[in-house]
Amino acid sequence: MQLLGSVASPFVRRLRLVLAGQPYQFVALNIFESEGRSVLVQHNPARKVPVLVDGEQVIFDSGVIYRYLASKLKFKPLSWDQENGLTTINACTDSLVELLLCKRSGFDVTEDKLFFNLQHERIQATLEALEQQIRAGHFGDWDYPGISLFTLIDWILFRDLVDLKPFPVLLQFRNAHLNRPMVAETDPRLS
């Protein structure tokens, strides 16, 4: 199996952590340079990372890749509450990615514009919801939802996207998992 993706992507990192201890090859791509982009385009018409290549089978999207891996590796199925938690994590991550790309494209994402306002609103609401879910005992295991939350929080800090001081429970959650297997090895700060 090969996992194609960028070192910094939280969607890629979550799968690298899920695959800790499993036989696979990570192929690091810089999707903003022609060589990495060319490899990505050969495998995924949506031009997004991650991509899993397992023999002749090619899978796109971190959620779909996880379902494939869960079936292949016999992971415990996710509950509906866990699926909802993942949806919340993914919504926050997607909005942060959109704003980061807009900012890198020269837009002032603090302008009072509908698109930017909706992203900021979603980010705030999802972070509040995730903080409450941790307080309620969710994300207690180091499984796909917990790993996905960890990679989101750590990526926010890495990219300095949101001030997380108002979310002490999220910060505590992240800090509690820093010594997990492969966390240090997959840290985007090291690339």
Q: What is each PLM-predicted segment?
A:
Residues 1-114:
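GST-like domain detector, emphasizing the conserved glutathione-binding G-site
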Residues 2-3, 161, 185:
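Short, contiguous strand/loop micro-motifs
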Residues 77-78, 108-109, 165, 184-189:
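Short, hydrophobic secondary-structure boundary micro-motifs
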Residues 93-176:
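GST-like fold's C-terminal all-alpha helical module
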Residues 169-191:
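Long hydrophobic alpha-helical segments typical of transmembrane helices together
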